[in-house]
Amino acid sequence: ELKELLAKMFSDLYSQTMMMLRSCEIDYENPPDISKSVVAVNGVPLGTQDNLFCITGGEGTGKSNYVGAILAGALGEKRLPIEKTLGLEITANPKGLAVLHYDTEQSEAQLHKNLGKTLRRASLTAVPEFCHSLYLASLSRKDRLKLIRESMDLFHHRHGGIHLVVIDGIADLIRSA
């Protein structure tokens, strides 16, 4: 009886936590949908729609060029040949879902130049309306985080979903980095 009473008391006390727990618990009888690959190499997924994919490297090692190849692949209705995406298999974006590119490091002029390279790689002459490349170097860390959070929500609703989000320079968003 005491055990039941305590269980009820804690259940009432932590009702909000209990609701969150239920939503987080794995239901083995109802498996989740399989994650869809967005970035792969030789058929092996590196980045999926519901996970993070991180590219690291020293200054001047070509990270922005690599990011440009990923973005180029995400801009078209059909998959680009791997020669244009540096050997990566990038899932095409036939529905025109949002492709968001936030850069915290490059100057506005450099980001403009990089975007031009991305468009040429994708064989495009103009930025698709669902693609948003945003230069955040001039903003404070707090403002960058707010802008990213709110714009992702805005663009998700505007374009019917998000295909890809790239944050180039994510370390600049971390207080202790």
Report each predicted region and the residues it spans.
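Long, basic/Gly/Ser/Thr-rich N-terminal segments
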Residues: 1-8
